[in-house]
């Protein structure tokens, strides 16, 4: 069994961060060692919540504890998501350094969660700068959305060609795989009823589209689900393209179930059979 140290947010109610990623990854046969960066009552897009940011020292202590019982050599990947402070970025890098010492083949997937002007997504000051300065140079995989891609590269991105230039800039900095979630108005198809996503590697760029469900309130945690299931499929031995397609069909099933149930929260439990055996078969097209 493959193991992932997943360092991201936790919500008591609902599905975001580790709550969104853990169960689907376990369904796919990958164990998740969940280490929380924050513990909130619910995700921040409700507009009100309670809870706390986990002190950065606690992350280091937990990682050291895993090393003390000689378990870091069993860690196949590090996954990072929502961070509660810029200082936590340093602890992510500490965790990566320790894991790589024990298992040089371990992967690092960085989901660079950043504040969004149209969403109540509260991210601490300095996180963006710390991710750009410290995470990009060491990440094997990054999974930004379109807004986060703009912030990471500081490129103006309005067209599909702009997206390609931006992802190639990240690849040039050493990131081996870049997934850009929900291209929106910068998509290749640019249809409001279509969800578009790309995967870029040094070997090329692949594009995939599927229906975009029109929720009254867009569920949170979809990016966490995408990052987690893509990583799980890679660890299960699938090729880049196979993992990209599998993830998209698994996530499509979760979104379909969530929409049909009229839920604001992702319905990963209700959609468990869609994760295990997706009913859709969307395929990726190489576009560059």
Curated annotation (Swiss-Prot):
Kindly state which reaction or reactions the protein catalyses: pyridoxal + ATP = pyridoxal 5'-phosphate + ADP + H(+)
List of residues binding ATP: 111, 148, 181
Annotated GO biological process:
pyridoxal 5'-phosphate salvage
- Named cofactor requirement(s): Mg(2+)
Q: Which GO molecular function terms does the record list?
A: ATP binding; magnesium ion binding; pyridoxal kinase activity
The pathway where this protein functions is: Cofactor metabolism; pyridoxal 5'-phosphate salvage; pyridoxal 5'-phosphate from pyridoxal: step 1/1
| Statement: the UniProt record of this protein carries the keyword Methyltransferase | no
| GO (cellular component) term, any one | cytosol
Enzyme Commission number, as recorded = 2.7.1.35
Segments passing through the bilayer: none
Instruction: Say if the entry is tagged with keyword Membrane.
Output: no
**List of residues binding substrate:** 9, 44-45, 224
Alphabetically ordered keywords of this record = ATP-binding, Kinase, Magnesium, Nucleotide-binding, Transferase
**Which family is it part of?**
Belongs to the pyridoxine kinase family. PdxY subfamily.
Q: How does it assemble?
A: Homodimer.
Q: What does this protein do?
A: Pyridoxal kinase involved in the salvage pathway of pyridoxal 5'-phosphate (PLP). Catalyzes the phosphorylation of pyridoxal to PLP.
**Listed name of the protein:** Pyridoxal kinase PdxY
Q: Which gene encodes it?
A: pdxY
